[in-house]
UniProtKB/Swiss-Prot annotation:
It comes from Campylobacter curvus (strain 525.92). One of its GO terms (molecular function) is structural constituent of ribosome. GO terms for cellular component: cytosolic large ribosomal subunit. Keywords: Ribonucleoprotein, Ribosomal protein, RNA-binding, rRNA-binding. PANTHER family: 39S RIBOSOMAL PROTEIN L18, MITOCHONDRIAL, LARGE RIBOSOMAL SUBUNIT PROTEIN UL18M. HAMAP family: Ribosomal_uL18_B (MF_01337_B). CDD domains: Ribosomal_L18_L5e (cd00432). It comes from the Bacteria. Pfam families: Ribosomal_L18p. Belongs to the universal ribosomal protein uL18 family. SUPFAM superfamilies: Translational machinery components. The keyword rRNA-binding applies. This is Large ribosomal subunit protein uL18.
Length: 118
């Protein structure tokens, strides 16, 4: 892809991200689960927007996983155990402007399978 096309795709993702963030918010009991996907790995964190603090976080680099569906499922299982340890069973999913497809959908489905309500 050319640089112009990549710039446009990023601009559209940021536009979607801002639109989504205007509609959702997380609190301490139901935090916002924000996901970031790079070409190599996945990062996820649970955020309390009222106090602007990160409640829990998981990093694909520490687990040695790749940014694919299988890696997303492994990361979701690990992240669900961290949330359960902090007695959180409900969250609001922030797909961060990414389309709900592939890795993002696999992560959300695996998080639900591990007992976190989204």
């Amino acid at each position: 892809m050319t640089a112009k096309v990549l710039k446009r795709k990023l601009a559209l993702r940021i536009k979607r991200k801002r639109r989504i963030r205007g509609k959702i918010s997380g609190v301490a009991t139901t935090p916002r689960v924000s996901i970031f996907k790079s070409n190599r790995t996945i990062y996820v964190q649970a955020i309390d927007d009222v106090t602007a603090t990160t409640i829990a976080a998981a990093d694909g680099r520490k687990l040695g996983i790749k940014a694919n569906k299988e890696g997303a499922a492994i990361l979701a299982k690990e992240f669900a155990s961290v949330l359960k340890a902090k007695k959180i069973d409900t969250a609001v999913f922030d797909r961060n402007g990414y389309l709900y497809h592939g890795v993002i959908a696999a992560f959300a489905d695996a998080l639900r399978e591990n007992g976190i309500k989204l």
